[in-house]
Amino acid sequence: MSNQPVSLNHPAAAPKNERRLRGVALISVLTALMLTLLLEALDQTVVGTALPKIIGALQGFQDYTWVVTAYTLGSITMIPIISKLSDQFGRKWFLITGTTIFLVGSALSGAAQTIDQLIAFRALQGVGAGIGIALVFTVVGDIFTPAERAKWQAIFGVVYGFANLIGPTLGGWLTDHGPLISGLITDTTRWRWVFYINLPVGIIALAALLVYLPTNISVRSSTHVGWAAIRRIDFPGAFLIASATICLLLGLTWGSNQIYAWGSAQVIGILAGSAALYVLFFVRERFAAEPVLPLDLFRNQVFASAAILSLLQLMILVALIIYLPLFLQGVLGISATYSGALITPMTISSVIGASLAGVIIANTKRYHLITIVGSLVMTAGVFLLATMTPSTSLFTAAVYMVIAGLGLGVYFSVLNLAAQNAIPRSRLGVGTGSVRFLGQLGGVLGVAIVGTVVNNTLASDIVKRLPAGAAKQLTPTGLQYATNPQILVNSQYRATVVHTATDFAVKNAVAHVPPGPQHAQTIAAITAQVTQQVQHLLSQVFEALRLSLAVAIQHGLIAILIFCGITIIVTLFLKDIPMVQRYNAEHAEASAPSESKEDLPVKP
């Protein structure tokens, strides 16, 4: 594997000289890009805490997970093709189109009247978000030289990580405290603010992009124009990778959410179909004139390492986002609001980690050593998190999260920068998009793997802890509801289960009481006795569930720790490449040969 940027050997030559952005135009474009990324990344996690209220309003509990899955499917399938098309035809109008689609999807999601409508509109919203996520980091690479990119990629990485971390807290706050609007937003429909909040911010960003983002910021000079260029688009490759990814995500979602068993024909069949489609995609890419995902990029050691690290980073980050709040609320017994406040220091530490890494890289023009340090700090933090028990203090948990966040933050600064520095500018879109695609895929893989570990551990451990006779007294169905982790984090669900189980037991107990002069008193006495017995039994079941959940999440954190160990190994291959200080050679006109200095970094 080479550490130098791959040579193009391609009929398309280097990009035209871009108009450099300065002053108001530069500030406006950067602000718009940050707002776009913030909203589109935020919507990956902001809906989770609002889902109970949404399901309560729209019904359709059986489709609970699809509200999140639809967004992921829409976004991840768009990244590869849009990244490639932006290299061929420019970025501005793709970015504006994606932002518009995202805002339309947000408005429609907020106005949804049924769960099916919400799922469809979330998919539309995801399509727009996928376009934005694919292009925002790429446009930053267009604007700045690699030597300048370090601090800006750090800032944008912080925005992306901050959005993912703060999403659950913001979603919960909007659902509980969003403003009321007479006739439109009531106490039971405050959840609509989760989607409507995107509109004013997104419109400002859209206007700034329309006015200040140059159309020639990244357009490639090419001998192919018009329909000739369109005919070279790899539509079969785009269809194959989208289909393969959808099948993969569906299989992982079905298995990890226990919709179907991992060994079921449905899961095995769709995962096998995904594997077959990926094989066809890789074969197709070897012969495509303009491949959606040029496989030769992965022969570059630095680019391949950055892409794999993006996959691993999101596996770790998203799994922590999902399961740390569950531990804090379900095991340590704090509220959702307090849980969000406790995770805030982790968010701040990730910002500090990213900022420090950005400053160090900007000054040294090197990223290898700081990335190794970041991986070690992150691993130490996750190791400490994996030692938490039901008796762990909140302060201790917060300290452990701060350490993990500090290490994770380093990766927000490094990965896009390293990948972009390792490839020619004419491949900036498809290269950056590949890194983002693997990152999005990593988020799904991480949750699927850790979720399976947590669910399997919980199912086996709870059996050992249940009080004797619990299954007989509560019935299998009642026990299933009583051992659902939602019991520990949702007081309304817990009250419903207690009421239902008590009512069922009382009715069975009094069904055969013979009539007589003391009938009413007997019924009252039996009701009081059975109620006390059932509630005592349920309190024991809930405590057993709390202890089992602690063990299950601990095992899940050990799985995340394994991801961290792999990250350390891959980081060793992320070697330094001298960063370009200026674009003198890279701004050669279209007549420049494809193997010119455009492919070579300029040493600082």
Per-range role (PLM):
Residues 54-55, 85-86, 170-187, 252, ...:
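Interfacial helix-cap and linker-helix signal at transmembrane-aqueous boundaries
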Residues 24-79, 83, 117, 233-236, ...:
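Transmembrane core module of solute transporters
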Residues 107-111, 206-211, 279-282, 383-386, ...:
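Membrane-embedded alpha-helical segments of multi-pass transporters/permeases
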Residues 137, 153, 159-160, 176-179, ...:
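Small-residue-rich alpha-helical segments with characteristic i,i+4
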Residues 83-238, 348:
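Helix-loop-helix hairpins in multi-pass membrane proteins, especially solute transporters
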